[in-house]
Amino acid sequence: MEAMSLFENNLSQPLAARLRPKTLEEYVGQTHLLGKGKVLRRLIESDQISSMIFWGPPGVGKTTLARIIANTTKAAFIDFSAVTSGIKEIRSVMQKAEENRRYGEKTIVFVDEIHRFNKAQQDAFLPFVEKGSIILIGATTENPSFEVNSALLSRCKVFVLQELKTAELVQLLKRALTDEKGFGTQKINIEDELLEMIAVFANGDARTALSTLEMAVLNGDMDAGSATAVTRETLEQCLSLIHISEPTRPISI
């Protein structure tokens, strides 16, 4: 039974999902926006959020930050994918937001990959943004100046999210090893040098870093004391597999 313990901590969810931060204090990275006294942090803490676009590479926390904003401001949160949604879905969501507004509740509509919407789809948000029915938060890996139409862009603040630094990724990996939502209930032996190796490989992407650690731990060697040891050899094998599958990884966190 001890050998199965690694699978008992709700591993129906990936490690990155289990460790998704719920507060600004848990959030790692983007200190240029979220450090004490920084503009975006002040807007969140004072509940003065308006429509905005998060522009940044994959795995830097765009979706997570939108959820934290919704939790902090006590707004209804509607997660909306530009890949699977059209005008019909937009109208349905806007109707729900109007209902919330009548009851005095704010609605944050988070649109992942907003650059995938065409002009007509983006225009469908305009009247609701203008009259304050919704707070629109869009996420994109593409330059919004070219991918978001000017009318909508002019009504949104653009915040640039940066790749996580190697030290920030190492911090995240160490948390995964100690947090009960991660591997905190297990005894995992992995050298700091290997954690840094994962962080460098992840190239600023938190999801890739956590997924790599998860694969390495689940493929580690169990010793007589029920500890899992992650060796350099095991990690290198995992890195080679992840490298092969890298183009298909999700593009946001």
Predicted regions and their residues:
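Conserved AAA+ ATPase "SRH/arginine-finger" region at the nucleotide-binding site
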Residues: 157-170
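Walker A/P-loop
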Residues: 3-8, 44-79, 126
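Short glycine-rich substrate-engagement loop in P-loop NTPases that contacts/grips substrate
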Residues: 78-107
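Pre-Walker A (pre-P-loop) alpha-helix and adjacent loop at the N terminus of AAA/AAA+ ATPase modules
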Residues: 10-52
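Conserved C-terminal helix/linker of AAA+ ATPases
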Residues: 220-241
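Single conserved hydrophobic/aromatic residue that forms the stacking wall/gate
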Residues: 242-253
